[in-house]
Amino acid sequence: MNVDFIAGINNLGEKIYTCEPFKTSFQNPFIVALIITAVVLVVFFAICNPPVDKKRKTKTAIYVYICIVALLFLHYYVLNHQLNDIYNKSNMDVIVSSIHDKYKGGDEIIPPISPPSVSNELEEDQPKKIAAGSKPADSKPADSKPASSADSKPLVPLQEVIMPSQYNN
């Protein structure tokens, strides 16, 4: 087959599918509700044949019309209110607008949330404190004497000894 012919058929199918009336008719919730109601009615009449009696036929017709109106309003409400973003916006618009709403336009910088401080921490979880300029307690020889409190230096957290804080100048 000719390649141009196949490409033309594919292009024609794409044009038919993306035809503007086709797209807008299925994006309109009322049209979708009408189609769903028609399918429900066809199934209803296929399963339950209406009675032959004239009084019962009128009563059945009234019930069917009430069902049609109720289904139309139900489908219209569901499609229009709950799926509004799908019919009226593209997915990217929904994502961008949700980010915009969440961060109020992105102008504000939201500070990170710090974890809450726990008052009953275990002793090994707390940073070890050593005297500034001295060696850690594990590296002292066994025969060394403990320093008296008068001549010892103030205790500094071990993390600050290894990595001095930028803010303590």
UniProtKB/Swiss-Prot annotation:
Nucleotide-binding keyword on record: no
Glycan-carrying positions: 88
Region (Disordered): 107-169
Biased composition (Low complexity): 144-154
Keyword Transmembrane: yes
GO annotation, cellular component aspect: host cell membrane; membrane; virion component
Membrane topology: Multi-pass membrane protein
Transmembrane segments: 28-48, 60-80
Protein name: Transmembrane protein B169L
Protein species of origin: African swine fever virus (isolate Tick/South Africa/Pretoriuskop Pr4/1996) (ASFV)
